[in-house]
Amino acid sequence: MISTIPPLDLAAEAAARARQGTLTKPSGSLGRLEELSVQLAAITGEARPSVVDKAVIIMAGDHGVVAEGVSAYPAEDTRQMVLNFLRGGAAINALARQAQARVVIVDVGVAADLAPQAGLELRKVAHGTRNMALGPAMTRIQAEEAIAVGMQVVEGEAARGLDLVATGDMGIGNTTASAAIAAALTGCPPAQVTGRGAGLDDAGLARKIAVIERALAVNQPDPRDPLDVLSKVGGLEIAGLVGVIFGAAAHRIPVVIDGFISGAAALVAAGLVTDVKPYLIAAHQSVEVGHRVILERLGLRPLLDLGLRLGEGTGAVLAFHLIEAAARILNEMATFAEAGVSDKT
């Protein structure tokens, strides 16, 4: 199911680091941008990596656990927001236009049947998950199928010359599934990794935590088996994003991880295949409390902290600008010798 993840290219990494030391600036003066450029080289295997073709892949799926009152918004908003994406009217569309990135929308588990149209990939594994408070959200086979969808979508994008990919999501109730995954895989109590999602009040938050506790008690997901956790308390769109991560890493494409939902997918992916970790770039620190726990567990430092909690891939696409800047610095700055500028003595 999982393609072989190639190791980082240490020669390209060393060449990029060496070039950074010759550019017309004090070594290390551009901080994280220099680190990013070296990481891009190691991932892509190119000492002078380019970031031209960019895309955000949005996996969409519904959650049966919404029936427990864990979301401030109704389940039908998943379908409605997918249509909004297709019309170009969502936050991710505006930000992707600014970043000159494509928006790829994938129905991997929307409860409603969507009509075929340009810009939408119909790859439905199921009409949403089942209510995880009563039993497994999906079967293990369904989780594997959704992962395969994500990998296949990236395969198609890679054939177009994709240089950089962001993970995006749409699914009412998916912060509940993500919190359950985080609790199961980190061992943290649900209260420590569960936030207000799209805007729950105090009573709603307490109900959400109780539902997650019940789901974990009912399903007993095995923390030693991330696929078991994913299938029992996860979501189809989260599984799809696991596949996006695997597919990108297999093709040496850097993966920009968005917020809490994408972080949960990254936690599962890294639990299944540790070798994906170096391919991940954490875009931002989400307001969702569990996101910090996930990033710490993955050993990732976010590039941005803007108080975001929307999802859709918005934070990841904002980070595209910094990542492209890192590549441009490495590729376009002159060396001391080229510029005729004296280096330090």
Predicted regions and their residues:
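N-terminal loops that bind phosphate or other acidic moieties
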Residues: 1-345
